[in-house]
From Swiss-Prot:
Feature: compositional bias, Basic and acidic residues: 368-377
Family the entry assigns: Belongs to the MDM34 family.
Keyword Isomerase among UniProt keywords: no
GO MF, any single term: lipid binding
Region (Disordered): 21-60, 368-459
GO biological process: mitochondrial genome maintenance; mitochondrion-endoplasmic reticulum membrane tethering; phospholipid transport
Cell location: Mitochondrion outer membrane
Species annotation: Zygosaccharomyces rouxii (strain ATCC 2623 / CBS 732 / NBRC 1130 / NCYC 568 / NRRL Y-229)
Domain observations: Lacks alpha-helical transmembrane segments, suggesting that it resides in the membrane via beta-sheet conformations similar to those predicted for other outer membrane proteins and porin. The SMP-LTD domain is a barrel-like domain that can bind various types of glycerophospholipids in its interior and mediate their transfer between two adjacent bilayers.
Full protein name: Mitochondrial distribution and morphology protein 34
Function: Component of the ERMES/MDM complex, which serves as a molecular tether to connect the endoplasmic reticulum (ER) and mitochondria. Components of this complex are involved in the control of mitochondrial shape and protein biogenesis, and function in nonvesicular lipid trafficking between the ER and mitochondria. MDM34 is required for the interaction of the ER-resident membrane protein MMM1 and the outer mitochondrial membrane-resident beta-barrel protein MDM10.
């Protein structure tokens, strides 16, 4: 079963006006119970509040940012709603006449709401919080912002239970499908309000809309006398005289031009969100307090070299910005000391010579006067220059210098006469002894100073690379300090053959007598290790060359050797002898 609504009733503006009034009344009545205390007057952060006690005093008060009531300014139904009756129960019950289940669908509806909210959330929380937990604010005045919300393209599909009673129509929504577009005049608060509206839709269809429909249906069930009585009561309420503001002579002083100017600046500051000097309790009126928006002006008036040469500073900043854009943000730019300390001259002023010394002196004096006391004396830099001449040295030592130069060539042949430098024998002449002139006699005194002969570069195959490097460094030195030989050393000390000299090599580099024919050293692993490139003793001349075994590739392919050196345990070493290079 279904029926159609009269389309002319929806096209008539009177129906929209009734809907607008009923929605306004329903929204304000539902929000009045849960509204927080409204601030009526604020003085130095302390406000007097008018509280509305709810039914139960034990419930906690909810924070509400609504400053005024909700006003539905416009309602429009371009498309006629549709109502479909799914189930109907007509029974002679004492409480209801008709009971049914219906499906309601509405499309392209529009609703516009206007209200005012409190922008100072600190005031809302401070008035609803205990006094011991609320700090004393310097400026905690109320600041209201008007907001207009428009709901367009509303699409509603719902399953409802309808109860027709003697006094009106009761309705409840079971299954609701709602979609709409939301637009707010405050774009900053649009996302927040939209999120809160979605959470409050349950309250809207559970309490607000049923009360609106029931109040509108009462006009159909009330008698004519009751309707006339209600209209008469409304007219009496409208005919009450509105209260007038009566000003006394004492109040005229508060309406002075200065107070009116102060009130006008207060209103303009709330509308533009700006702070003026005429408003009380703002940082600009507090002595010694500086606002953030005026900080650049204060810095520009400070006497400093950077402010006097501001044009050079701006050019350097623009140049750094251009370099940063061209190079990229990943490359760090060098930090200039001029940017860190503003009381410095730019480099360009020094290069171009555009500075003025009297001006710089005046700026420095003003900075010193502002930062120090009058009784404090400035610390001047003093430069002391001694004008005393240098003492002239006597010329007597200059005459002695040529004498010393003449004596030096005489001492050199004497040293050569004491001990001639022996020639370096070659490897072929290593077996021949080194002969020294027998005519040279050693002095009898034990502390005879003689020059040491140049060391003999005898090639020993057993010496390691480290010993060779030491011998080369020793031979490279051109100057050798004079040596003092003991009395026991005579000229016969230098007549030993070269094989005795080679026997004086360090013990750790001397060859060890090892029996290589032992069965311990003839294993396949050690034989391959001697002839392989990776052997640490492959270059030594002590190993006997042997033929390569056929299994040599097994060790060469596997380069991850499981040993460090030769595990030689057959030789017995004394306490005085050094161990071999590779010992287990």
């Amino acid at each position: 079963m279904s029926f159609r609504f009269n389309s002319q009733a929806f096209e008539d503006n009177s129906f929209n006006e009734k809907i607008r009034e009923k929605l306004t009344q329903a929204l304000n009545s539902s929000s009045s119970d849960s509204r927080s205390p409204k601030v009526t007057k604020t003085t130095m952060g302390e406000g007097s509040t008018s509280k509305k006690d709810s039914g139960s005093g034990g419930k906690s008060r909810k924070f509400d940012i609504l400053k005024s009531g909700i006003t539905v300014s416009k309602v429009n139904f371009p498309t006629t709603p549709q109502l479909e009756i799914l189930d109907l129960d007509i029974s002679a019950q004492p409480r209801s006449l008709v009971k049914g289940i219906c499906k309601i669908s509405c499309k392209d509806a529009m609703l516009q709401i206007q209200t005012e909210v409190e922008a100072n959330l600190l005031l809302v929380y401070s008035e609803c919080s205990p006094s011991f937990a609320t700090p004393n604010m310097i400026c905690n005045d109320s600041f209201t912002i008007p907001i207009t919300m428009v709901f367009s393209e509303i699409r509603l599909e719902a399953i409802t239970n309808i109860f027709v009673k003697h006094s009106g129509i009761g309705i409840s929504f079971n299954d609701v499908n709602l979609d709409f577009k939301f637009d707010c005049s405050m774009k900053i608060l649009q996302s927040t309000i939209e999120r809160r509206l979605k959470n409050s839709m349950h309250h809207l269809f559970k309490e607000v809309l049923p009360s609106v429909i029931f109040s509108m249906s009462q006009s159909l069930f009330l008698s004519e006398a009751a309707r006339n009585q209600e209209m008469h009561n409304e007219s009496r309420g409208d005919s009450r005289p509105s209260p007038r503001v009566v000003l006394e002579e004492s109040d005229l002083q508060e309406l002075s031009p200065a107070n009116m100017l102060r009130l006008s600046t207060l209103i303009s500051s709330r509308q533009t969100l700006s702070l003026h000097g005429t408003v009380l309790n703002v940082p600009s009126t507090i002595p010694g307090c500086l606002e953030r928006q005026n900080l650049h002006r204060f810095n520009s008036r400070i006497p400093s070299l950077s402010n006097y040469y501001a044009s050079y500073k701006e050019e350097e900043k623009s140049r750094q910005v251009e370099v940063k854009k061209s190079v990229g943000s990943s490359v760090p730019l060098p930090h200039t000391s001029f940017a860190a300390n503003p009381n410095l001259l730019p480099v360009r002023t020094l290069q171009e010579g555009a500075y003025d010394l009297p001006t710089i002196t005046g700026i420095q004096n003003r900075i010193f006067e502002r930062s120090t006391d009058e009784n404090e004396r400035p610390r001047r830099r003093k430069l002391k220059i001694k004008m005393s001449g240098r003492k002239q040295q006597p010329q007597a030592p200059k005459e002695e210098e040529p004498k010393q130069a003449e004596q030096q060539p005489e001492t050199e042949p004497q040293q050569q006469r004491l001990l001639p430098t022996p020639e370096i024998p070659s490897r072929e002449q290593a077996s021949t002894p080194v002969d020294i002139d027998p005519t040279v006699s050693t002095p009898d005194s034990p502390d005879t100073e003689i020059t040491s002969p140049k060391p003999l570069s005898i090639r020993n195959p057993i010496l390691s690379d480290v010993e060779k490097m030491d011998s080369e460094d020793a031979s490279a030195k051109s100057f050798v300090a004079p040596l003092k030989l003991p009395v026991s050393i005579t000229s016969k000390y230098f007549n030993y053959p070269a094989d005795h000299i080679s026997a004086q090599t360090p013990r750790r580099y001397s060859p060890q007598r090892i029996n290589w024919e032992d069965a311990l050293f003839n294993t396949s692993e050690l034989s391959n290790l001697r002839t392989s490139l990776y052997s640490p003793i492959a270059r030594g001349s002590l190993l006997n060359p042997t033929k390569e075994r056929p299994d040599r590739g097994r060790i060469l392919d596997n380069r991850r050797l499981s040993f460090v050196g030769l595990n030689f345990k057959g030789g017995k070493w004394g306490d005085d002898d050094d161990p071999p290079p590779y010992s287990g």
